[in-house]
């Protein structure tokens, strides 16, 4: 992630915010010439601040990104004081490490892989 020179936060503060809060990333993509907003669980790399998400291969999100990889994103608190991270970029779609990334985001957002939802999501990892 490239940090704007005018940003109030440095890389360390951005990583702290992203790793300490379990707020889904809101992705804005283009679908059929109209904006589509999706909330998606994510993980973040401490060194690069690269955000990794997992979505089913047949999802509208993936179909939209295959047609146009440009995204806008926001990871922000819903309550005052409002703060967060937002930006734009290009999504990179890959099937590498899908199971590992899925496991990581499930544990991050659900706390474990023991719930029915977690088992259902993990069961669809190869689809």
Tell where the protein language model's regions lie, with residue ranges.
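Charged, gly/pro-rich active-site loop segments
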Residues: 1-9, 83-127
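Short, basic/aromatic recognition patches
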Residues: 2-26
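Short beta-strand segments
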Residues: 22-57, 71-75, 85-86
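Short histidine-centered beta-strand/loop micro-motifs
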Residues: 53-55, 63-64, 76, 101
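Short, solvent-exposed aromatic-acidic interface loops
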Residues: 55-60, 109
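Helix-adjacent hinge/juxtasegments
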Residues: 61-88, 92
């Amino acid at each position: 992630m490239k940090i704007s020179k005018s940003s109030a936060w440095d890389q360390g503060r951005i990583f702290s915010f992203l790793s300490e809060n379990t707020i889904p990333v809101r992705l804005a993509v283009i679908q059929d010439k109209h904006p589509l907003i999706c909330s998606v669980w994510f993980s973040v790399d401490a060194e690069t601040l690269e955000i990794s998400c997992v979505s089913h291969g047949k999802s509208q999100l993936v179909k939209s990104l295959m047609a146009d990889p440009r995204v806008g994103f926001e990871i922000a608190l819903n309550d005052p004081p409002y703060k967060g991270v937002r930006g734009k970029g290009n999504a990179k779609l890959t099937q590498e490490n899908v199971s590992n990334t899925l496991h990581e985001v499930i544990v991050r957002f659900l706390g474990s892989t023991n719930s029915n939802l977690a088992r259902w999501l993990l069961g669809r990892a190869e689809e």
